[in-house]
């Protein structure tokens, strides 16, 4: 017994000794125990202590002794040769095995070292030389594992095989968006949601899908406009493959310009903006387009109630691919569908997106993008009147009057870009872009009157045209440097030449009498006010992982020069993530943004004729400071929960002054605009089910957005609600796969009403012409519109074919026919007096519950129950 106890004491003492020894003492102990000698260079770092060594043989002891150190050992007879581990860089692209399309945000791991592919599917991983096991995963794809022996820097492309059985909505580990990202407020909406979520008339829509996310409000029902965290629709930077677009809507806002078949990935940033983004104050919508299938010709054709779409992609030779997508509106069905919507019969829109990519090898790729979209509508009216007239001698004659009017409105975007990707040695990735983004709208009104007085003909015709044009030319270079798996440094710079022509117009008048021209005058003609501007930007951000803590500090610098004045802007950014446990994560962030362009409404509602203008020597850039924090939980398999709060300060916001609610020309607009401050704050909750046959989410947003004009020109200098200040918003999305042939999806949305300015009564003021009556408005945006809510459902019937599949989509928009306030009008509550058959008189008010003479709002609903059906054939 004593012998056993003595042995135990010696073993414990030995263990304690090992636990407290230094690395060199541990090496000396192994030399004594196993009769070996260590051979190494004097510069080899052998400092530090050994936690514990409990191996039963020399090999196991050496593994434990040098674990976690950049030291490699080799046993040669009685010698153990030590040398410093050399690091090598493994880089390449992750792609879809069936199409060759690069995958954005794929996770690449070797042990506890990981990376994520960037916007071009590129990854860079620095690992110790020798044998490694590489694991690559991506949502909706089978995981792939490779065993590699690395003795030098190496390029390894990885192709993943799609797996329809994998329905998880997240990838464990490293991500650019969601819980795994350092920044908060970055959300990626899956392609399955974009293509399967029920939408108006069955048209899958990128921007409307974003409206299902917390913190994102819509405009009127059916609109694809975005109001993010208390901001306006012009405060969202919409990027198509990194190129800004000024108008993202078709059909007066009912559809977005992005055809889902051409889209690879959509990411929304609403806070903690990475330093590489700038130019808007509320959100960044980064839309990445397909590169093209490298394995064969594939595509799809879709016929719906309103549009026809076609998409085709494939290889052009061994290293070149293309992607081509087109969409047109059914003009024949617009009258049937558009009449109850108040749309003109003669309406047409189209868009086309083309992309070609070429690989010169593992280090160089070139991409060419082109997009063009246009909307056009025209209304014509004609009226004939026949009546009898008498001349000064009381002689009768016949008069024929032919009155005609015409209205045309055209608008559209043109975007083109050329990009070059280059890899410098595996750790440094660059992307150089030359791009053009243009937008133009044109409005024409014409009135004509032809009069025939017994053969004597006269004509009077007037014509008014108005156009606005924007053109941006931009060279830009971005770099991504990965010195280690725990650090990614991004930096870059660009210059944009802006040209704004907001007010081109012409006004002409022509008169004829008896076949002779009496007057043919161009009353006014202007090629528009030429408003150029230069915008330069540069940025630096450093994403660092320090164990459970990740940081992304950055700085974005911008300089805008216009109207002889320079506006520099230093915009610090900081994001932090703390992984408290495997289930709980905390995040916080701060970002400053600046915006140098503004959209001014041409009328009282948003139209494609709205005017974009740059900052001037009188109107400074709009700025915002946003603080946000959030908590995230993933402890329940297949579920994730998150809660975020934010506060945003706004400076130099623009509001039309009282009684000046419309644009009045580029030379006058500064006089109708007041600048002020704003604030927006709120909380957002999101519950996601991310795995299984049933997936989806529930989100709730509680928010407030206000404005104030300190000079008192609006609302006497008091705070007033922003026009899209909606207190509550609830979104529910669900997707259920019954089997591989049938799937269902449904959305239910509720939102508090937005704000409008409503006169409350008539008042009288003394003017130059005496007592004058006018409407009295107590405050700006003083009335809350009724809330909106609706349920949309959709079902897909799929059938595999020898090549591709057939899909029938049947949906219903606004299932229970909610009478939502699609637009509002106001009226005066009048008393009407009428006589009954018995001779007595009675009177009544339009609205008995409202005092006589009071102004009240009337709700008008456009979208009732709308069924839809579409047919898609893929090949």
Kindly label every feature range from the protein language model.
Residues 66-67, 116, 122, 140-142, ...:
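Periplasmic N-terminal accessory/gating domains of Gram-negative outer-membrane beta-barrel systems
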Residues 27-34, 69, 75, 79-109, ...:
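Short, acidic, small-residue-rich periplasmic hinge/interaction motif at the N-terminus
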